[in-house]
């Protein structure tokens, strides 16, 4: 297996720790006035989603995780699995609800998602950064109601709830940032 030194650590690097694939979220190089330098690293375990902090002595090596990120199109959900397809080979992969997690509310048919595979099995599903969804339920915006600047909650076609401006009505299609679950704009 390939190894990587602590001086090559950076955000997004995938490592094997305790026989489990992890991704580095943050890396801080610390050189104290007295003693050996070290790296303080914030890591998320890909299988469980737990975030933890770990320190590595300068010069230590870690095994690189044998994970693969591929872009697949979301097809459908049959209640138990979420099905994705490779557009070039037409190969289909089924991901369970644990791999999809909270991202299920951002899955729209035919949208391209990034799937992380470990030993050929999907362990995480990342939706596109922006999705366009229809508003299925929201309170009507009253003319002249400018009291609150926070907007109003709106339920989208996938079941997700986001805060939208007062002028958004039922049936409109809006663009949402899936990373922050925030309204971006109306789609013409």
Swiss-Prot record:
Gene Ontology MF terms in the entry: translation elongation factor activity
Family matches, as CDD domains: S1_EF-P_repeat_1, S1_EF-P_repeat_2
UniProt source species: Vibrio campbellii (strain ATCC BAA-1116)
InterPro entries: Elong-fact-P_C, NA-bd_OB-fold, Rib_uL2_dom2, Transl_elong_fac_P/YeiP, Transl_elong_KOW-like, Transl_elong_P/YeiP_cen, Transl_elong_P/YeiP_CS, Transl_elongation_fac_P
Pathway: Protein biosynthesis; polypeptide chain elongation
Post-translational modification note: May be beta-lysylated on the epsilon-amino group of Lys-34 by the combined action of EpmA and EpmB, and then hydroxylated on the C5 position of the same residue by EpmC (if this protein is present). Lysylation is critical for the stimulatory effect of EF-P on peptide-bond formation. The lysylation moiety may extend toward the peptidyltransferase center and stabilize the terminal 3-CCA end of the tRNA. Hydroxylation of the C5 position on Lys-34 may allow additional potential stabilizing hydrogen-bond interactions with the P-tRNA.
Cystine bridges: none
GO biological process, one term: peptide biosynthetic process
Coiled-coil intervals, chain numbering: none
Modified residues (N6-(3,6-diaminohexanoyl)-5-hydroxylysine): 34
HAMAP family: EF_P
Name of the featured protein: Elongation factor P
Native organism taxonomy: Bacteria, Pseudomonadati, Pseudomonadota, Gammaproteobacteria, Vibrionales
């Amino acid at each position: 297996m390939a190894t990587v030194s602590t001086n090559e650590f950076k955000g997004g690097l995938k490592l094997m720790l305790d026989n489990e694939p992890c991704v580095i979220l943050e890396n801080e190089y610390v050189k104290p006035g007295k003693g050996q330098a070290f790296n303080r690293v914030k890591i998320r375990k890909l299988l469980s989603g737990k975030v933890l902090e770990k320190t590595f002595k300068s010069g230590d090596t870690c095994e690189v995780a044998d994970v693969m990120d591929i872009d697949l199109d979301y097809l459908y959900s049959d209640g138990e699995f979420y099905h994705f397809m490779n557009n070039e080979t037409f190969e289909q992969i089924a991901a369970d609800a644990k791999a999809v997690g909270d991202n299920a509310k951002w899955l729209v048919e035919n949208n391209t998602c990034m799937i992380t595979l470990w030993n050929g099995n999907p362990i995480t599903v990342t939706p596109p950064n922006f999705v366009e969804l229809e508003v299925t339920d929201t309170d009507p915006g009253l003319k002249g109601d400018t009291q609150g600047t926070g907007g109003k909650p709106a339920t989208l076609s996938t079941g997700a709830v986001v805060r939208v401006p007062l002028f958004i009505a039922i049936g409109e299609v809006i663009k949402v940032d899936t990373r922050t679950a925030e309204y971006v704009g109306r789609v013409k």
